[in-house]
């Protein structure tokens, strides 16, 4: 008995160091089970007949008795040292206490916790026999099927001050055990901690009704994200047409600068697609185009490059012979160079067999001569016909802001500027829309002028030039004079119009020479007919 007492004291000391506050409340259970084990060893009492009586006792006593004492059928188990069974008794009692203290939501996490896979738990479970494990499983099933009232009394019922102290000690002990396990596991199996204060009291998200988006004034509180993005919301919900009621009732003082710029860009985009109103007494030039349009393309006033184009009611001509002036310089049809429009007859027939559409489009536009061609010809910075590579060779090594004016290499544009900025040579083409010249016709906020020379004069001032715009402060003068023929053309174009050149008593070649520097302004687009092409 002295040897058993020493072993028990050693085991009790280790359990107190391991479980902290849980040792005081659970040592009583171990003492009770050890005393019963010793008394049964002396009296050699068999528990085979007392099994029905154990069902009426508490679940903890059943587990302790069945694990502390094995059946009497095996004589070797009857004389076995009961101190070897004490660790299993303590482990099972810990699990039962935890099951009775924690909530049902945390019971599953407890089964998967680190205590089930601890080294001491695995070794001491092997010391139990198969019969002991089976009896433990039956007791667990029996405990789950008990009535809810008894479980509630066992978990939450407090009959005396002693029971209250034991419940509080279990709570503190379980908390300390959780901290110990979390320190042991570390980052491998982090345990999530829930805090009620971390959750927001209310959510910032709210449902937005469609009627709120159609209001003229912002219904959201000032300073919120929706109030700051109100101009973007109205940009996608309000109509863009200038004839809508939104523009009539809208207060410009409530709109930011960015919103106004976006609205102007959208209005310019619509005017480019639809055309502008022609001036009074202007001669309208009609251009009818019949195109085999692939269904992949969008059917609109701007036809994609590579489509068949026909003037008037004439028959279709081969793509390689499309050299007329009407075909090569029309902006609205986006006709590029002849090599970009060449399509083989086989591919054209293949597109027709796939169910293409035959579109008849009538495009109305007016021809206008460059208003200040005489001033441009007399300007020393104008070099005439020149490509970008020749311009870069002339500007190499020149200071910041050096520029020259030249003819654009693209057929859809008349002039371009080459200039030095950021230690390199850059190029910008001069675009035209509605009889105004600028470096970006699609953006109405960019500076525009009715003449090309007026545009160059504006960008000579560095203070009025943005970082992404051309800087034209120092002109690179040309080293040769223009011929008398060029100068005479500039003088004649100043005194007449594009349509007035046809009334001059000049040969057709000279008339074409006088019409060279002109641009086309689209004024109206009408869809005449759209019918599917019959498959051949």
UniProtKB/Swiss-Prot annotation:
Protein name according to UniProt: Suppressor of cytokine signaling 5
One GO biological process term: epidermal growth factor receptor signaling pathway
Function: SOCS family proteins form part of a classical negative feedback system that regulates cytokine signal transduction. May be a substrate-recognition component of a SCF-like ECS (Elongin BC-CUL2/5-SOCS-box protein) E3 ubiquitin-protein ligase complex which mediates the ubiquitination and subsequent proteasomal degradation of target proteins. Inhibits for instance EGF signaling by mediating the degradation of the EGF receptor/EGFR. Involved in the regulation of T-helper cell differentiation by inhibiting of the IL4 signaling pathway which promotes differentiation into the Th2 phenotype.
Protein keywords: Growth regulation, SH2 domain, Signal transduction inhibitor, Ubl conjugation pathway
Bias (Low complexity) ranges: 158-169
Gene3D superfamilies: SH2 domain
InterPro entries: SH2, SH2_dom_sf, SOCS4/SOCS5_dom, SOCS5_SOCS, SOCS_box, SOCS_box-like_dom_sf
Region (Required for interaction with IL4R): 1-50
SUPFAM superfamilies reported for this sequence: SH2 domain, SOCS box-like
Description of how the protein assembles with itself and partners: Interacts with EGFR. Interacts with ELOB and ELOC; mediates EGFR ubiquitination and degradation. Interacts with IL4R; inhibits IL4 signaling.
Limits of the SOCS box domain: 471-520
SMART domains to which the protein is assigned, alphabetical: SH2, SOCS, SOCS_box
